[in-house]
Design a protein with these regions (language model features):
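Short functional micro-motifs and their immediate structural scaffolds
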Residues: 23-25, 67
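Short cysteine-rich clusters marking metal-coordination/redox-active sites
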Residues: 16-19, 59
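Acceptor-substrate binding/catalytic loop of class I
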Residues: 48, 223-238
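Short glycine/proline- and charge-enriched loop/turn segments
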Residues: 37-42, 81-88, 220-228, 267-274
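Short, well-structured beta-strand/strand-turn elements
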Residues: 136, 250-254
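Conserved SAM-binding loop
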Residues: 8, 12-13, 24, 100-219, ...
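Extended interfacial segments that mediate partner engagement and assembly in macromolecular machines
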Residues: 45-143
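A C-terminal cap/extension of S-adenosyl-L-methionine-dependent methyltransferases
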Residues: 2-14, 32-52, 253-309
Length: 309
């Protein structure tokens, strides 16, 4: 396991990343960061919960929960570039979940000429897009770990680095996707605005993200896995709609998202002492329940909007 890069982190005050307001309705959660416990998996996708997070405030105007203060963006970039990756099977499961959502929306796309996935990981979702019928698929991913795990075809299709519209063709994409990534981006409004410029008329931007107002998050409170050192903001239905509407998307829809994962993965997300977690995982393996697939609405949202036709 890789050691976290440069454990020296500074925090600076921040206004709302969606609307720019400094008006706060409440503090959602207080800071809990233990720098000595950071590892190479701390900034990896679909990891076991660590229980570390920034102080998060809820914006009074747009209802997004955001880290304030937040870490230096250069420090964050270093963590993502050097993050470990050990979730190939879970990456494929996530891609299948997202593929089902895309198939339900295919009839509303202008065509299946070109698609871009922001935060592409090892490219598992690019494989799904090809099977759906997209003629040209591209991705962008900053972390070296998942890129090393990608197939040769996907390594060629994925731009290494952080998303910049300068690297992609303006007005050419029928579909841009961003799955469990908007929580990690410092300037999420800027990203959403730049994606709009990449879409062809009638093109679709699809987001899947955590919902801090979901029942699971409200019940588990600070023990919920959505409160994580990777997350600079968390959304609700209201704030995700605000993000898309304020930037200029049309025909916006927001809804809960169901995930289909093995029981072993779901159990990994349950907050409990390590010894109990290990015992539970062993029991699931012995009883052959670990790979039993279960669909749950565990507290995610999907939201989409179209560019003007």
């Amino acid at each position: 396991m890789t050691a976290v890069q440069n454990k020296s982190m500074s925090l600076t005050p921040r206004v709302c990343p969606l609307c720019g307001s400094s008006r706060v309705s409440s503090v959602l959660i207080d800071e809990d960061i233990r720098m000595s416990e950071l590892t190479g998996l701390s900034f990896a996708s679909r990891k076991a919960p660590e229980g570390m997070h920034y102080k998060m405030a809820i914006c009074e105007l747009c209802d997004v929960a955001y880290a304030n203060p937040a870490p230096d963006i250069r420090w964050l970039h270093d963590q993502y570039v050097n993050a470990d990756f050990d979730t190939v099977s879970e990456s494929r499961d996530a891609a299948q979940n997202h593929g089902r959502l895309i198939r339900s929306l295919l009839g509303r796309l202008p065509d299946v000429d070109r698609a871009l996935d922001i935060g592409a990981g090892d490219g598992a979702f690019l494989d799904v897009l090809r099977r759906i019928g997209f003629r040209q698929v591209e991705g962008v991913e900053p972390s070296e770990g998942p890129l090393r795990a990608a197939s040769d075809e996907n390594q060629k299709a994925i731009q290494k680095g952080f998303f910049s519209e300068m690297d992609f063709a303006v007005g050419k994409y029928s579909l841009v996707t961003c799955f469990q990534t908007v929580e990690h981006v410092e300037d999420v409004r800027g990203l959403t605005r730049r994606v709009l410029r990449l879409l062809k008329p009638g093109g679709l931007f699809l987001i899947v993200c955590h919902n801090f107002r979901a029942l699971t998050a409200r019940l588990l409170k600070q023990r919920s896995p959505i409160f994580d050192i990777e997350h600079l903001q968390l959304f609700s239905s209201a704030s995700l709609h605000y993000l898309l509407d304020d930037v200029g998307y049309e025909h916006i829809a927001i809804a809960p998202f169901s995930n289909h994962y093995p029981l072993g993965y779901w159990f990994k997300l349950v907050p409990m002492p390590t010894r109990l977690q290990d015992l539970g995982q062993r029991l699931l393996c012995v009883t052959k329940l670990s790979q039993l697939y279960v669909s749950l609405r565990a507290g995610n949202l999907y939201g989409y909007g179209f560019s003007r036709s």
